[in-house]
Amino acid sequence: QLEAMVGGLPIRGPDAVVSELADEAGQAVLHATHDGYLKRFGLLHARRLRLSPAGDKLDGVDILEPPKGKLRLKQDLPYAIHFHLHPDCRCTERERGTCKIMLSDGQVWIFNVEGAALSIEESLFFVDSAGPRPGLQLVLRGTTFGETAVRWTMHAENPHVLV
């Protein structure tokens, strides 16, 4: 066990996590927040996800902000939002802020971001007992001075071929 080797969890988790799931006009909406970056960086993180009724489009927004009552951080902070892909996925960058994700079953999804720079980078997949496997991740980078909203969307290129 990794925890036993390092004497605890390798990364300290947040103290407060709040989530709410709702149905809004037939769309599943999840809103979640945590304070995992508060002590070290002075930021709270919130994510809002909206899934279409057909399951062919996922809209998201990640919000980084200081606690209420604080207008600005002492300095601008760089951030990186990571989306790790399964090792069987292939990914190619298209125009700026957009990439194409190809699944092993032939499905194709388009990922688009506003408010951050998109890059495709190497990653490791640790989920199964076979050990780590190389994979890819989408990384959204930018700088925040106090409050930043990064909006992104993932949708099926051909919704009628969803399995």
PLM region spans:
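CBM-like, beta-strand-rich accessory domains located in the C-terminal region of large
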Residues: 1-163
